[in-house]
Amino acid sequence: MKALLMTVAAAGSLMLAGQAGAVDAKAAEALAQKNGCLACHGVANKVVGPGYKDVAAKYKGDKTAEAKLIAKVKAGGSGVWGPIPMPANSPHVKDEDIKTIVQWILTL
């Protein structure tokens, strides 16, 4: 009985730990809208830049994806998804907003 109780407690702790780092999808999408990201990116489809689901698929399993994408969003870049460059978004988009948006994209 004690072992069962310990197992249930450990499972509950893991579930809560997973939720602590979870991104609020609605809030993140609202940040993307507010900061103009959705003018060039769709969630499920390409607009000017790639759709966010395509970005998530490309970086699935890449443990360095978050850092790479944050750097790309801040500095801008070209040649990865087509000929149209993405403009730099720093400093006019807050670092914490960029991080939240990137974390959300990677959950799609």
PLM-predicted stretches and their roles:
Residues 1-4:
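Positively charged n-region of N-terminal signal peptides that target proteins for export
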Residues 16-32, 58-60:
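Electrostatic cytochrome c docking/interface patches
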Residues 36-43, 101:
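The canonical Cys-X-X-Cys-His
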Residues 48-59, 72-102:
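Axial heme c-ligation environment in periplasmic c-type cytochrome domains
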